[in-house]
């Protein structure tokens, strides 16, 4: 397969936030203990007019701004999410139409818990690398839900990022050196049809689920590339909370300097399918030519996708062509628990 890489990327976040103290206060919990345990201080809250489709459209348009290509040249659009607005009606079609891609393209909505976005990137790599098309777009986005009073309510957040994959060397802002996946049947987190909120295995979501897959996915990628943590300038992992992310990074030998730009959960919460794509977007916003990035996603059920990426000198030309992830994080408005319940549709009669 020929060399492929990222030619454009973009991110989007709702402006609304809720602090852990407001959620904990509503349930009589110790906010400081929760913040220490999860390493999460606040999370994003989608407004009443925001969903996975609107977030994906904004992220995709910003990716197009950075890529500087004709959207009609994109041959595939994939949107990975746990929270597609419709059970039957593709989000990918909405995104493509809003971005001027349609009608000569293929599209699909993807699901694999929190790694559907990175699965889409792998699909785009294959389609572009095999010369089936010139460009392909993958989006990872979610407006995640947690049941009132559940531990997930402190982290389940909203946001997403889009990536346009191409192969023209002069257009690449980052190239893929390799990818690796590790997948099993592990029932750590699930939601059946017609259920409003997901269920999870509590502590079972840790060692036998998240850590097993992230660490094995990472080790498999390093073995394939014959590398160690010292060979990379940055890293990003799936982040259901800050504690898991930091633990995984340290177990693999990464330092805070390497993992800090990818870690957004303390200020954003867990954006599910958007978590790793958003973390990677923040790294790209800060990266320079020849920086090497190590990426590992995780999706419950369960699996991990890993990537080895090298940034090119074109990165400096495109960063300022769209709003950065850091600027989106800084643009925020806090809401209280009552407004949060209203915006998330949690008040049910």
Swiss-Prot record:
The keyword ATP-binding does not apply. (3S)-3-hydroxy-3-methylglutaryl-CoA binds at residues 30-31, 114, 155, 205, 238, 270, 300. It catalyses: acetoacetyl-CoA + acetyl-CoA + H2O = (3S)-3-hydroxy-3-methylglutaryl-CoA + CoA + H(+). CoA binds at residues 203, 243. It holds the Pfam family ACP_syn_III_C. SUPFAM superfamilies: Thiolase-like (SSF53901). HAMAP family: HMG_CoA_synth_arch (MF_01409). This is Hydroxymethylglutaryl-CoA synthase.
